């Protein structure tokens, strides 16, 4: 299996998560009178921030849409990192670790503030990222030592003697 496979799966998973997240953010019709009673104050209570009047609802929608674009950014980053993993695995490593760190933080946040679906998506994403590191021989494999790359330098960046 190519090292890019789990990273492409991460990209697809993030895109699917983005669709779910966006559909939740854009849903503005209350499902019940009680929910409508909760949303009305959020939509009507104004706060002046730096000279601009905003409602709590504005913040809810704005932050939700910002997260939507962050999902897409991570999906794109995972796809581009997959390309890199096949051609220059050592250069892909920091991007994979960065995504894994971000997903770890997301797992904690999801556990504290959200529900099962984001937790499951985050855990699957983390498993795929770890799998990509294993495929690249960067964790859990004796192949994680120094390897020669095309330009004659070792994978550690030090010139071979």
Per-region residue spans from a language model:
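N-terminal signal-anchor transmembrane alpha helix
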Residues: 7-32
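Hydrophobic alpha-helical transmembrane segments of integral membrane proteins
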Residues: 87-125
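Juxtamembrane non-transmembrane "cap" segments at the membrane-aqueous interface
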Residues: 30-42, 88
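Juxtamembrane membrane-water interface segments that cap and precede transmembrane helices
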Residues: 44-60
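Membrane-interface capping segments at transmembrane-helix boundaries
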Residues: 83-84, 134-148
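Short, intrinsically disordered terminal tails adjacent to the first/last structured region
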Residues: 142-161
